[in-house]
Each structure stands twice: as C-alpha cells, then as structure tokens.
C-alpha cells in the first residue's frame, strides 16, 4: 500500500528531528526522554531513592531516565500493554492495569510503601479526528489520575500528558483540588504543532 503524503511528511520530520538523532546518539529508547529531562530540570520531580511508577512506559525512554536518577536505592515500576525490553533496576508489569490481575501485580510490586511519583506519557493511537482523539486522550489521563489516587503516598507527585481541548480545563481543575500545586509545561521537545502539554501536580493532598 503506498504511503500517504501525511505519512511521508511524518517520516521525514521524524528522521530529521534533532531529538530523534540525540536519542540515538545518547542510547535512549525514544525522543520522549527529552521532554521529561526538561521538566526535571525545571521541577526536580525525580530524586535519589524514590519509588516511581511509569505508565505507558514502552519503549522505555522515560523509564531509562528515571532509573538513572533514582539510583540503586530507588526503584522504577514500568507499566504498559506493550512488551518492553528489560532495563537494569526496573520492574516491568506488562498488561492493561484496568484489569484486576494486572493491577494486583502492580500493587504487589509496590507493596505497602506506595509511590513517590506517578508519571504517565500515555496517548491514544491518533486518528486525526479531534472528536475521537480528545476523548480517548482524556480517558487515559483519567485512568492515570485514578491510579495515582490509589498508589501515591501523601505529598507525592503526579506528571501526566494532556492534550489541550475538550475537558482539559475540567481535568486541571480536578488536579488542583487533589494536589497542592499544579503547573502546565510545554517542553521544547514536544512538537510545536502538537496540542500536547504536561501537567505537573505536586503534593498529593491527604483526603
């Protein structure tokens, strides 16, 4: 099947992308690592000894970066419905955490201590139709927020990918009721024409 003009354009942009080239040169699994790196430089979410849950982790760029910063006394639990190659010091929970068995495995790995940080870079497969894509994206963000409610320690932090559009404002308002401080970040590595942003929610409130 011949490729469409849009897919040709995407491929050209992908291989010309400075962040794709950097990721290849620096041994990271995806360009997405530079979004997290920029957020980290500004917000200092990741620290030595932390327990981190990474949702939508495959292929593992964020997981790699987080594991390097939490160090040998910290741990990263990576969750995705897609298979993911192992990484040193990382526990991978493969499967859909909406399913009870997968969620139980995830909770068992974390134990009673819970998590200091939940990160979600989850996004739906985009159709190009906003009326379809935006509800799917917000649904994934809701799932991530619900998991954060379950596993975060009091005072813990939550980082989540969002797309500006329907339900965005309501979601951010919800975060502000549950966390002490919420900021919106648009990393330079996020493609300019994308409506993708990240919400940084600090200090999970005790309910």
Curated annotation (Swiss-Prot):
It holds the Pfam family FtsJ. Its main location: cytoplasm. One of its GO terms (cellular component) is cytoplasm. The active site is at 161 (proton acceptor). It catalyses: uridine(2552) in 23S rRNA + S-adenosyl-L-methionine = 2'-O-methyluridine(2552) in 23S rRNA + S-adenosyl-L-homocysteine + H(+). It comes from the Bacteria. Disulfide bonds: none annotated. It is an enzyme of class 2 (transferase). Its EC number is 2.1.1.166. GO terms for molecular function: rRNA (uridine-2'-O-)-methyltransferase activity. Keywords: Cytoplasm, Methyltransferase, rRNA processing, S-adenosyl-L-methionine, Transferase. PANTHER family: RIBOSOMAL RNA METHYLTRANSFERASE (PTHR10920), RRNA METHYLTRANSFERASE 2, MITOCHONDRIAL (PTHR10920:SF18). Belongs to the class I-like SAM-binding methyltransferase superfamily. RNA methyltransferase RlmE family. Specifically methylates the uridine in position 2552 of 23S rRNA at the 2'-O position of the ribose in the fully assembled 50S ribosomal subunit. This is Ribosomal RNA large subunit methyltransferase E. It comes from Thioalkalivibrio sulfidiphilus (strain HL-EbGR7). The gene is rlmE.
